[in-house]
């Protein structure tokens, strides 16, 4: 089931959980979507700022599988 997250802090907390498997990054012209797959939910965070999105991408945990979708 999908669930949207509004805060970057909450997204990073979810990314550090044990059941977090993979992150998909979808880039559009206007925004960047980060979708993290956990055991129960697919959490989505929408970031409008491109610089903020790059910072967030670098701050993801190293053990997490990252896949970029265009």
From Swiss-Prot:
One of its GO terms (biological process) is protein-RNA complex assembly. InterPro entries: Ribosomal_eL38, Ribosomal_eL38_sf. GO terms for cellular component: cytosolic large ribosomal subunit. It comes from Aedes aegypti. The lineage of its organism: Eukaryota, Metazoa, Ecdysozoa, Arthropoda, Hexapoda. Keywords: Ribonucleoprotein, Ribosomal protein. Belongs to the eukaryotic ribosomal protein eL38 family. Gene3D superfamilies: 3.30.720.90. Disulfide bonds: none annotated. One of its GO terms (molecular function) is structural constituent of ribosome. PANTHER family: 60S RIBOSOMAL PROTEIN L38, LARGE RIBOSOMAL SUBUNIT PROTEIN EL38. This is Large ribosomal subunit protein eL38.
């Amino acid at each position: 089931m999908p669930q949207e997250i509004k805060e970057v802090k909450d997204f990073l907390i979810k990314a550090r959980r044990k059941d977090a498997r993979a992150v998909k990054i979808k880039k559009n012209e206007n925004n960047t979507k980060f979708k993290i797959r956990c055991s129960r939910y697919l959490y989505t965070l929408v970031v409008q700022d491109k610089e903020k999105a790059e910072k967030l991408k670098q701050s993801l945990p190293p053990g997490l599988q990252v896949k970029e979708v265009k």
